[in-house]
Amino acid sequence: MSRKMFSCDFETTTKLDDCRVWAYGYMEIGNLDNYKIGNSLDEFMQWVMEIQADLYFHNLKFDGAFIVNWLEQHGFKWSNEGLPNTYNTIISKMGQWYMIDICFGYRGKRKLHTVIYDSLKKLPFPVKKIAKDFQLPLLKGDIDYHTERPVGHEITPEEYEYIKNDIEIIARALDIQFKQGLDRMTAGSDSLKGFKDILSTKKFNKVFPKLSLPMDKEIRKAYRGGFTWLNDKYKEKEIGEGMVFDVNSLYPSQMYSRPLPYGAPIVFQGKYEKDEQYPLYIQRIRFEFELKEGYIPTIQIKKNPFFKGNEYLKNSGVEPVELYLTNVDLELIQEHYELYNVEYIDGFKFREKTGLFKDFIDKWTYVKTHEEGAKKQLAKLMLNSLYGKFASNPDVTGKVPYLKDDGSLGFRVGDEEYKDPVYTPMGVFITAWARFTTITAAQACYDRIIYCDTDSIHLTGTEVPEIIKDIVDPKKLGYWAHESTFKRAKYLRQKTYIQDIYVKEVDGKLKECSPDEATTTKFSVKCAGMTDTIKKKVTFDNFAVGFSSMGKPKPVQVNGGVVLVDSVFTIK
């Protein structure tokens, strides 16, 4: 008999000296009439012990702290051996919560347990966005979190409706996912399973063999993220009119059309020599470099005390640097930089194939373009979650919670734990091709380029650039979509900028448009880490390095659970 599944949520107090759950709600996924809303954590945990089901909280890192705190204060201890009256957790070294498994005992060989998962890992969006994007017949409401609610507080009709909506939105969305066969712990795992189902597990294991941990560690040194760069020429200055273009599904488009690695790599010494059987390669290289005049910098060196990890470098400084580079990255670097004192050390070479992901991407692109609401959003999730799964870190050493003397939770690093890599070379080359796509487009617009962010280019002026004029389309895979045209803008650093965007009213909503069609402008604030509350205080006049405001919630572990303390946000 399959286990029941429930969407759950807590509402909690906001005082450091009075941290507790003042309301809970649960609703059965697939049976929305089976729900309850109450005002006692003890009552909820009694139900948890009796129900022995799978529960989903949206942001388990927050709600889970109250559950683990309760377990510790009621005689349960952490254990990964499945003993009675223990609980196990999956919490990453970075503090990401995935699961709490509470064991109450055994009936014969059957484990009596309730497992609690994070729905945010399956649906990585705010509840409000899920309701809107999935076109669900209800919306997330609002309540005042800071209202005094003493122990035993009777839930008001407004609060009741708010909690019910929250748990119902997630229950409906998860039900749709599960009915599509998307039943793994994370969106990435769902996507990888979907790909294996199309390819077959047997073929997957042949095409993407398990590499040893030492080899994976070496190859992983060539793995880098998206290209995010601000042109110094425009830094901290108000700019006039400009345009933004985004690649439609950047990573899936690279997976669809680029040559990508497969099979067991071959190690080579020295400089890679052309090999038609193994045309893709990762080269370990030591060199000094100087940026050529008129070129965008593309070299970024992390975990090195001599360089800022987020800065793209114009030269190598006083010492040669050692990097692991795909042939895609190396060719870009050779075009953009003068290289000196080059030493080719060794590397890995790979067979290549184009179209490994064609059937998978065709399937979900069809759904994305022919469906609306939930199915469309799930298709986008499937398309965008696969590439990163290939480069999952095999070091899964986690954190273990414990109760400190003051009644708050502490976390220690658990025993070292490793899993098999998936196939890191794939993640390495997909991201390399993605950077290549963005950087080559930006370089071709060198006299206009303001900013790049992974899949987008921001340009001065309002003419479509020559390099992309034949591949501009709002939907086609790998084409550039004209995202917006702005009247003025200001960029401070990576992921920190404001724009007045040209818009017109369509069916009561503001839509981006050309300057000729515009009836007004919409003020847009993009700033990593800045809350919507603080964004409302931003203007062109005060948007600068050093801007400071209260309104950033900082989680603090206290006796009973977690309190979000209002703290200062500063643009540095």
Swiss-Prot record:
Belongs to the DNA polymerase type-B family. Mg(2+) 2 binds at D246, V247, D453, D455. Interacts with the primer terminal protein; this interaction allows the initiation of TP-primed DNA replication at both viral DNA ends. Interacts with DNA. Mg(2+) 1 binds at D142, D166. The record marks I90 as: Involved in binding template-primer structures. This DNA polymerase requires a protein as a primer. The record marks Y251, K380, Y387 as: Probably involved in nucleotide binding selection. Residues 56-66 are annotated as: Interaction with the primer terminal protein. Keywords: DNA replication, DNA-binding, DNA-directed DNA polymerase, Early protein, Exonuclease, Hydrolase, Magnesium, Metal-binding, Nuclease, Nucleotide-binding, Nucleotidyltransferase, Transferase, Viral DNA replication. Residues 1-222 are annotated as: 3'-5' exonuclease and strand displacement activities. The record marks S249, N384, G388, T431, R435, K495, Y497 as: Probably involved in binding template-primer structures. One of its GO terms (biological process) is DNA replication. This is DNA polymerase. Residues 227-572 are annotated as: Initiation, polymerization and pyrophosphorolytic activities. The keyword DNA-binding applies. The lineage of its organism: Viruses, Duplodnaviria, Heunggongvirae, Uroviricota, Caudoviricetes. Gene3D superfamilies: DNA polymerase, domain 5, DNA polymerase, domain 6, Helix hairpin bin, Palm domain of DNA polymerase, Ribonuclease H-like superfamily/Ribonuclease H, TPR 1 domain of DNA polymerase. One of its GO terms (molecular function) is nucleoside binding.
